[in-house]
Amino acid sequence: MNSLIFGKQLAFHKIVPTTAIGWLVPLGNPSLQIPGQKQLGSIHRWLREKLQQDHKDTEDKDFFSNNGILLAVPKKKVSHQKKRQKLYGPGKKQLKMIHHLNKCPSCGHYKRANTLCMYCVGQISHIWKTHTAKEEIKPRQEEELSELDQRVLYPGRRDTKYTKDLKDKDNYLERRVRTLKKD
């Protein structure tokens, strides 16, 4: 218990980083040591002396100064220019040009080789949606009702401005740009 408290004091005074405290705990506890093992009291003495020296010195010393440890941490945000240089710069990290473009046999637009033409896929999905849409089947009771009775019995919903704006998808959804036709 004593060594645990002592380790926290060391971390507080920046003599030993907090990640190194874990190996200090078994050193002070004799019950955790192997019977033939030497007592390691000299380490505790050295750490106590170091702690007392820091109390004597009024200067706040950093554990990492002149210790040969360099902390590699970015100090500033990477600029837009540096990002572009990495992205488009020389080497294997450079963006590659797409050279494997072919002509779509059905519509004649550019497409990547060994893939489907996105324009044709969009057309097929549109056809599937229109043909598979189910028509609403009205019950027989509603067929005989007049228009006034239907309005009284089933007032329906009134769309708010928000729902009307949501239904107008052309304003906020970006459509896929059609590729150029190959000449």
UniProtKB/Swiss-Prot annotation:
What job does the chain carry out?
Component of the mitochondrial ribosome (mitoribosome), a dedicated translation machinery responsible for the synthesis of mitochondrial genome-encoded proteins, including at least some of the essential transmembrane subunits of the mitochondrial respiratory chain. The mitoribosomes are attached to the mitochondrial inner membrane and translation products are cotranslationally integrated into the membrane.
- State if Translocase is listed as a keyword: no
User: What range does the record give for the signal peptide?
Assistant: none
> Further notes on this entry?
Present with 1700 molecules/cell in log phase SD medium.
Which one GO biological process term can you cite for this protein? Answer: mitochondrial translation
Q: Per UniProt, where does Zn(2+) bind?
A: C104, C107, C117, C120
**Keywords of the record:** Mitochondrion, Ribonucleoprotein, Ribosomal protein, Transit peptide
One Pfam match: Ribosomal_L32p
This protein's record includes keyword Ubl conjugation: no
Q: Where does the UniProt annotation locate this protein? A: Mitochondrion
Q: Which InterPro entries match?
A: Mitoribosomal_protein_bL32 (IPR051991), Ribosomal_bL32 (IPR002677), Ribosomal_zn-bd (IPR011332)
Which GO terms label this protein's molecular function in UniProt? structural constituent of ribosome; zinc ion binding
PTM summary from the entry reads: MRPL32 precursor is processed by the m-AAA protease (composed of YTA12/RCA1 and YTA10/AFG3), which cleaves the N-terminal transit peptide. Cleavage by the m-AAA protease takes place prior to assembly into the large subunit, an essential step for mitochondrial ribosome (mitoribosome) assembly. Proper processing by the m-AAA protease is dependent on the zinc-binding region within the tightly folded C-terminal domain of MRPL32: zinc-dependent folding halts degradation initiated from the N-terminus and triggers the release of mature MRPL32.
Mind telling me what this protein is named?
Large ribosomal subunit protein bL32m
- What family name appears in the similarity comment? Belongs to the bacterial ribosomal protein bL32 family.
